[in-house]
């Protein structure tokens, strides 16, 4: 079967125009022999639903558009749509075939409920509840398809025995620097998809969205993988493409002419993703130009260069702030010349002898320049600064922060990569960064780079990887510094609320892990004995009846394990016995505490909630194979119960 992937750049909610283009692409694909056309997950409606009061009107307009598509496309198509489920995105895929529309996820859910298929796969994987009941599996032209919107869906196809020939993965995550799989085909050798092909024994068709939806960036790079891991076809990143591949379920390989997977260059892809995100985010806000503050520091140089690459030098207006340092002044002027930017110079001495006040006034001048030129002011704040350096009561930075989801150490890497293309940023500017002023940070490395690397390691471990403070300190050392970093992260929360939007470049933004206002409690590094619950005694109870039930279940599990060990010993000619031990009340309480931890980590009894990490930006189920770095938590989910 020939399958076409229509990698198209769209504007979310531009329903009629997008539908017209879908019909055009379907006709073109059909002319080239395609028997199924798959459109990207974000093409029609983006990745985030509208507010509930607007849902009714949107769905009515969407229904009209879908009917039009069903009447005009010449071949079967899969058209993804988006709805709202309790405030969270609920993706769906409509199969358009012979003038009919079939909602694949809803059909799968109803079929599971009607036939009791929910328990069909129970016990086949690591979990007992089986795969998601709304996981679409359908047949078309003699080929059996599975459809996945998330990594959780892919995990279900990996873990359970589905009779599918092809798995269609419709990417809805967006690019993230900490997840190679998010770059789709360009990183196929570094991501999870080759493992998915091997685990499922099916062809994997990755359908990449393209463009910027909200502040999430999608890079395209759709691909087709064979069950044995060869790359059969791939679309370019950051470009529209109609990818058509011949998928043969009967073929056992190898391909006559497979493609060689690219070597994944994360900084290069990230730079291009940020440039695309900046261009399209400004366009969505009604701007085509930007104003930047250039003072010779690392972040200001990176933002000015990124804006120039994204918008062109005639659309970037530079406010050159001088007087801080002669070397930085020289570097800032040289950067503006290299980028050919129009410049307005602002001496700090003319503002105020107070450095902090002068910096605030410079920000006000940047906003005035932007207003005068009809441009959007850009903030130079990176993710490290937003996490640790925006203090309550300080003047908020106006405008979009292109690097607001990129750690400072990663900015150094991005600038190094950009200079290999053309060396526009001076050595002085590349080293003009500050390490956040955290007590004891001097002990965490011999150089500013190594100390900054430690700070960003702690932040990423906590934010992106969701690791407890004690785990981070166990692996990286310096527990007091780790505690101070995370305390500062929480303390800066009120100031972050007044900062502008960022371009999403990670699997979790600072907004996804916002600290509750007014929460005075702070975590601290704890010993293994503390984390195991020693010393709790009998102070925690769920009620005598439940305590006894849990204790009895634990004893039964222990007796089963002991009987198994004894039988093994007897088979080996050895005498085995299980010594009787007195009831350990403290151990019972630790078991109860561990049970509470399990419910905390898994969302309690909310069985309909997906596993893995999930923030506002839909990054559930990450990462792929490999797990978290230094995954040494003794609180692994259901590890003790």
Region roles according to the model:
Residues 227, 257-296, 300-616, 621-641:
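ATP/NTP-dependent adenylation/nucleotidyl-transfer catalytic domains that generate, transfer
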């Amino acid at each position: 079967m020939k399958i076409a992937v229509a990698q198209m750049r769209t504007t979310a909610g531009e329903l009629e125009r997008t539908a017209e283009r879908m019909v055009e692409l379907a006709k073109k694909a059909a002319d080239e022999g395609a028997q199924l056309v798959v459109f990207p997950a974000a093409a029609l409606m983006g990745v985030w639903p509208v507010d509930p009061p607007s849902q009714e009107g949107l769905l009515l307009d969407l229904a009209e558009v879908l009917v039009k598509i069903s009447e005009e496309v010449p071949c079967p198509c899969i058209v993804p749509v988006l709805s709202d489920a309790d405030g969270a995105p609920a993706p769906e895929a409509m199969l358009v075939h012979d003038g009919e529309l079939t909602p694949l996820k809803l059909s799968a859910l109803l079929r599971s409920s009607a036939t009791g298929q929910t328990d069909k796969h129970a016990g086949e994987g690591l979990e007992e509840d089986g795969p998601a009941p709304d996981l679409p599996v359908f047949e078309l032209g003699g080929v059996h398809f599975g459809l996945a919107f998330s990594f959780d869906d892919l995990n279900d196809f990996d873990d359970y025995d589905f009779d599918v020939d092809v798995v269609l993965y419709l990417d809805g995550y967006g690019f993230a620097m900490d997840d190679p799989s998010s770059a789709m085909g360009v990183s196929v050798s570094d991501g999870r998809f080759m493992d998915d092909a091997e685990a499922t024994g099916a062809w994997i068709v990755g359908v990449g969205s393209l463009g910027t939806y909200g502040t999430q960036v999608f890079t395209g790079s759709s691909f087709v993988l064979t069950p044995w891991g060869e790359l059969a076809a791939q679309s370019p990143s950051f470009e529209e493409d109609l990818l058509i591949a011949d998928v043969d379920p009967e073929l056992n390989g190898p391909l006559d002419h497979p493609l060689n997977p690219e070597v994944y260059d994360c900084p290069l892809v990230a730079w291009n993703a940020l440039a695309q995100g900046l261009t399209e985010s400004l366009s969505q806000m009604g701007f085509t130009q930007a104003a930047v503050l250039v003072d010779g520091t690392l972040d200001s140089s990176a933002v000015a260069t990124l804006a120039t690459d994204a918008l062109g030098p005639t659309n970037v207006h530079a406010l050159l702030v001088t007087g801080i340092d002669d070397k930085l002044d020289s570097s800032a002027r040289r950067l503006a010349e290299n980028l050919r930017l129009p410049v307005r110079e602002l001496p700090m001495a003319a503002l105020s002898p107070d450095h902090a006040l002068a910096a605030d006034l410079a920000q006000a001048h940047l906003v005035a320049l932007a207003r005068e030129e009809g441009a959007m002011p850009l903030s130079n704040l990176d993710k490290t600064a937003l996490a640790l350096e925006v203090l309550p009561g300080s003047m908020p930075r106006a405008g979009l922060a292109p690097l607001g989801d990129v750690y400072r150490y990663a900015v150094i890497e991005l600038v190094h990569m950009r200079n290999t293309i053309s060396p526009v940023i001076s050595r002085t500017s590349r080293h003009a960064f500050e390490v956040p002023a955290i007590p004891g940070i001097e002990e965490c490395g011999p150089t500013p780079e190594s100390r900054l690397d430690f700070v960003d390691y702690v932040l990423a471990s906590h934010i992106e990887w969701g690791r407890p403070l004690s785990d981070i300190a166990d692996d990286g050392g310096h527990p007091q510094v780790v505690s101070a970093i995370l305390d500062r992260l929480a303390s800066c929360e009120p100031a972050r609320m007044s900062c502008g939007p960022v371009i999403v470049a990670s699997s979790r933004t600072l907004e996804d892990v916002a600290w509750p206002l007014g929460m005075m409690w702070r975590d601290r590094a704890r010993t293994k004995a503390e984390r195991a619950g020693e010393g709790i005694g009998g102070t925690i109870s769920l009620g005598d009846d439940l305590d006894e039930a849990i204790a009895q279940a634990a004893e039964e599990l222990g007796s089963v394990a002991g009987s198994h060990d004894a039988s093994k010993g007897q088979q080996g000619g050895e005498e085995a016995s299980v010594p009787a031990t007195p009831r350990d009340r403290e151990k019972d309480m630790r078991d109860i505490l561990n049970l509470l931890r399990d419910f905390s980590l898994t969302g309690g009894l909310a069985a309909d909630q997906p596993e893995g990490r999930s923030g506002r930006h839909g990054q559930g189920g990450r990462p792929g194979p490999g797990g978290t770095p230094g995954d040494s938590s003794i609180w692994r989910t259901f590890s003790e119960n």
